[in-house]
């Protein structure tokens, strides 16, 4: 059954770019935030992402991408916390690239299973390492947008930790950026 339109993102952004969804997968280990990235078919690192399934909400679609591409299961926020622009090769056209707008949803990973897409090499990185990997083989404007998503995700994780567990844990997390 199709979800109500109000729960879905538009198929095109205000600038006319096609819209996809990404799961910004994270975990906290030893007071440090880590992000789970996967390889694209073009060999770049990225967050698990893909099209919005017409039978799922945008956040459910992002969670599905996390499971399929990275084998990540967990709790996903229902509302995206940011967006960024990236490029994608046109299907079947090796040399044709188009811009896409990606809505980012924060997903706290609770469990890892074998990903359906076994060639994606899901790997955990610190925030700085994630920003460095995400910048590889990308033009600065795309790398900067991804770096802002990582920073915003860290800020959200710290804010959530503060509201749930008090200032002590939050200050330890902020030191481990």
Stretch-by-stretch model annotation:
Residues 1-30:
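Acidic, metal-coordinating catalytic segment for phosphate/diphosphate chemistry
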Residues 16-18, 44, 122:
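A residue-level structural signature of the nucleotidyltransferase/glycosyltransferase Rossmann-like core
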Residues 18-21, 42, 98-102:
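Short connector loops at helix/strand junctions that flank enzyme active sites
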Residues 28-34, 93-96:
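Short, solvent-exposed loop/turn segments that connect beta-strands within catalytic domains
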Residues 36-39:
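Short, acidic/hydrophobic/Gly-rich beta-strand patch recurrent on exposed beta strands
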Residues 46-49:
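A short gly/proline-enriched turn/hairpin at secondary-structure junctions
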Residues 52-142, 175-177:
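Unchanged
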Residues 137-177:
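Charged phosphate-binding loop/patch that engages nucleotide di/tri-phosphates or the phosphate backbone
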